[in-house]
Amino acid sequence: MAYTDFAFYGSGYFGDTLTEETSPKWLERASDELDAITFGRLTFAFPTVEAHAVKVKKAVCAIAEALYWIDVQRRASSAQKAEDGSYHGAVASISSGRESISYSAGSANSSVYAAAATSAEAQTNLIGSIAAQYLANIPDANGVNLLYAGGCWACTATQ
């Protein structure tokens, strides 16, 4: 279940990358990413303070856009042969004499999205940094920071 919808994406986050048709896919995937980052806290303790809930929704929107652009980079970086024998993908160079077209393997593009498209570690780092921008010091409904990954200090303290 996505933690936000296209209406919020357009009017609360003011996003313009996703369309109404594509937004359910990317908002749902972004919500899944946030569930992993927050250790599932959002599923049982979604913030009840409105300002905190808005931050979660904005995080979902920002992550959804990042996932969308990563997907665009993945598609663009791979030259694919179509059924008619033609190739589609990112063009690296074109020569006119004897007609030569070279397709990029994606390494020429140095954007964070291109890096994330070719590396799971880079994608995890990008999504994590986006989440941290929005969720730092935001508590869940039980008062636990959404990004808190530690144990119970009182339970482990020595006397």
Task: Give short role names for the model-derived ranges.
Residues 1-159:
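Divalent metal-cofactor coordination and adjacent catalytic microenvironments
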